[in-house]
Design a protein with these regions (language model features):
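A sequence-level/structural motif corresponding to short, flexible coil/turn segments enriched
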Residues: 1-305
Length: 305
């Protein structure tokens, strides 16, 4: 679409009934790359499909959650779980798999959710790592016993370092964005369910964390009101010149867009749609938000639309 929201072209790409699109990016050649639970699809600048890759190794599907193109020209997709592990897959520009690496897996359901390139041209990945509960080293209700998981790798997938942040219950990271002055902001969710996992529908909160270049927690904030969905988190964060903004779904009020600028009170709005599948800072200083039901919202810098 153009900058006014008018459709320039549209196309559809089949990844089967369980495709469940999770990420789309514009590539260096002006085309687009789409990633979902069953694979990835590359299209040209006019939306014409160029190639598709649905290969997998562990599990029924590759379960991609995010994809990026590195400055080296290669594509990197992350996701999981496959046999309990998270994965990082490196593709060349024609869609062939060059490297597939697996991480975690001590307990079931380790997942990578988001990937970005670091200033030193490595990869930084965030997601969720499963741990035990009060009775077992690996909890049976594994989706409710998680830590925020941050992994830095080289471009071949070799681990530089990894960190986890969390307590005895549930903390997850879903998206990460760089800060201009250094470090990163990430968004996730937190539920102190006190071993009553059914209470997360009322107790789930948005978790915002600032980390440094080594993944250390510098600051965090939790905001109540998040609508909790068990398997498909749909919240996203973007940074601005002097702050950040995020989008999620409020449990009572639809799409929830929230902006933080230092030394001012936070501003937020509730609007139509289901959640903040993706939020990006636009060149005019505003924001564009994609929701889970396909609604696209464009705001100005003050969240007016």
């Amino acid at each position: 679409m153009d900058k006014y929201g008018n459709t320039e072209w549209e196309n559809s790409y089949s990844l089967g009934a369980f495709g469940n699109g999770r990420s789309v990016i514009q590539t260096q050649d002006g085309g687009y790359l789409y990633a979902g639970w069953k694979g990835i699809v590359k299209a040209d600048a006019n939306g014409i499909e160029e190639w598709k890759n649905t290969s997998r190794q562990n599990g029924a599907y590759p379960y991609y959650e995010d994809v990026m193109q590195h400055s080296n020209g290669f594509y990197y997709a992350v996701g999981g779980p496959g046999a309990g592990q998270a994965q990082l897959v490196k593709f060349n520009e024609t869609g062939n798999v060059l490297t597939r690496k697996w991480y975690g897996g001590q307990c079931e359901d380790d997942i990578f959710r988001s990937i970005i390139e670091t200033p030193d041209e490595m990869l930084l990945i965030v997601g969720e790592k499963t741990h035990g509960n009060q009775s077992y080293s690996c909890a049976f209700n594994f989706m409710y016993y998680k830590d925020i998981w941050i992994v830095k790798t080289r471009t071949n997938g070799g681990v530089e370092w990894e960190k986890t942040h969390g307590g005895p219950y549930m903390e997850m990271a879903n998206d990460i964005a760089p800060i201009r002055s250094g470090g990163y902001m990430l968004i996730g969710n937190k539920c102190d369910h006190l071993y009553d996992i059914g209470s997360c529908s009322q107790k789930a909160k948005v978790l915002i964390m600032q980390i440094d270049e080594e993944g250390n927690n510098l600051n965090q904030e939790v905001i109540p009101g998040l609508k909790w969905m068990e398997r498909i988190p749909y919240y996203s964060i973007t940074t601005t010149n002097d702050g950040y903004a995020w989008a999620a779904e409020h449990k009572n009020n639809g799409t929830w867009i929230y902006q933080v600028i230092p030394n001012t009170d936070p501003s937020y709005i509730y609007t139509d749609g289901f959640g903040g599948f993706e939020i990006n800072h636009t060149t005019d200083g505003g924001f564009i938000i994609g929701t889970m039901d396909g609604l696209i919202i464009k705001t100005d810098s003050e969240l007016l639309y």
